[in-house]
């Protein structure tokens, strides 16, 4: 089912099937709140035919909060694992929303990929991100973390403040504030696999 706005522009969809009074959601995508409401109205229009709605939420958004009167069970299960394989290339391609006028030094610990284990300087020139491995990064603008933490932070799974608070990330408080602005809010969604 596709949700269209008043101008007949598609803004979301739900892939589903009905079986034994269960509405099975295979995939649901809404580009804005209007589409989200429209899709859920469509699903609720089937309530006379079903007892249960089952599906997966790839966004990590707590669904129970969105429903005023719902009896809902939510389970959190890892769906996909991620790992930064090449930190230097990752930094070069990352869509940083702003470009500070100073270098940030990342001290990365990676016991499985020696090319990632070490210090990296990241800076911006002429609208481009630059990155290179350095020997003994200075303590100024230093962020120290392991590759797992870097992956979780850069992909939006955990915010820098959370990682700092739980001692997965070591840095000065001013750098923590910069990281919070430098890393976009939101999580990538891999709703299909190969």
Where are these regions (language model features)?
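Intrinsically disordered, low-complexity, positively biased terminal segments
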Residues: 1-194
């Amino acid at each position: 089912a596709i949700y269209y706005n008043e101008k007949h522009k598609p803004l979301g969809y739900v892939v589903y099937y009905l079986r034994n009074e269960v509405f099975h959601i295979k995939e649901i995508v809404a580009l804005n709140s209007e589409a989200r409401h429209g899709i859920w109205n469509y699903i609720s229009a089937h309530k006379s035919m079903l007892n249960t709605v089952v599906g997966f939420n790839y966004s990590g958004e707590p669904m129970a909060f969105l429903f005023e009167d719902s009896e809902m069970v939510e389970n959190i299960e890892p769906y996909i694992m991620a790992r930064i394989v090449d930190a230097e290339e990752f930094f070069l391609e990352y869509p940083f929303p702003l470009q500070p006028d100073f270098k940030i030094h990342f001290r990365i610990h990676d016991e499985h990929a020696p090319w990632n284990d070490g210090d990296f300087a990241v800076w911006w020139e002429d609208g481009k991100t630059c990155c290179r491995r350095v020997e003994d990064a200075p303590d100024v603008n230093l962020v120290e973390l392991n590759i797992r933490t870097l992956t979780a932070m850069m992909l939006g799974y955990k915010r820098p403040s959370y990682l700092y608070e739980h001692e997965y990330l070591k840095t000065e408080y001013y750098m923590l504030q910069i990281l919070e602005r430098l890393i976009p809010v939101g999580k990538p969604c891999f709703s299909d696999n190969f």
